[in-house]
């Protein structure tokens, strides 16, 4: 993760964006040179740039289960502590019982239509829907969920400017 990603600058008024694990993972695992290399998927590069802009504006948010996914499977204690320290700069959106219930409803709605997803994905959808905030993700499953759920996906180009 680049130094710009580790600190939040001026928190400007504006909509917060719930960032999915996939985007955080892309930004955290790439070295700055790799994030702009021609061999990198252009969508991934755009997502990393979008996250960087959201972080700079103080609008990037997460939920606890995303934090857990990011911290799970870290190979060394030092890497874990470093990542934990970076992520501590970002608040978790507090979750309520209604978020879990809505996530279960979303899971059932999508499953009835043949669309599968993870519990974390549906919790992200529920939190974003209930709070009327967009989701930033490179995971194509979210486009499928959007067909059946009241969620908004943030196009990468809308973040900048």
Q: What would you call each of these model-derived segments?
A:
Residues 150-158:
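Short beta-strand->loop
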Residues 2-16, 91-136:
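Active-site neighborhoods of divalent-metal-dependent phosphate/nucleic-acid chemistry enzymes
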Residues 1-62, 72-85, 159-161:
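Short, well-structured N-terminal submotif of metal-dependent ribonuclease cores
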Residues 143-148:
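Short loop/helix-cap segments at secondary-structure boundaries that form the rim of catalytic
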Residues 77, 139-141:
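Short, polar loop motifs at secondary-structure junctions
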Residues 48, 63, 67, 80-83, ...:
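A general structural signal for well-ordered alpha-helical segments in protein cores
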Residues 24, 67-70, 142:
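A generic structural signal for short hydrophobic patches within well-formed alpha-helices
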């Amino acid at each position: 993760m680049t130094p710009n990603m580790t600190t939040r600058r001026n928190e400007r008024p504006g909509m917060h964006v719930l960032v999915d694990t996939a985007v955080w993972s892309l930004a955290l695992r790439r070295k700055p040179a790799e994030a702009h290399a021609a061999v990198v998927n252009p969508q991934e590069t755009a997502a990393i740039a979008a996250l960087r802009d959201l972080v700079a504006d103080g609008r990037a948010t997460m939920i606890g289960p995303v934090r857990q996914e990011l911290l799970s499977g870290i190979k060394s204690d030092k890497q874990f502590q470093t990542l934990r320290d970076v992520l501590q700069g970002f608040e978790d959106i507090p979750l309520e019982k209604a978020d879990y219930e809505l996530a279960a409803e979303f899971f059932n709605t999508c499953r009835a239509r043949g669309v599968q997803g993870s519990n974390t994905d549906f919790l992200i959808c529920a939190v974003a829907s209930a709070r009327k905030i967009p989701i930033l993700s490179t995971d194509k499953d979210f486009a499928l969920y959007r067909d059946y759920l009241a969620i908004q996906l943030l196009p990468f180009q809308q973040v900048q400017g």
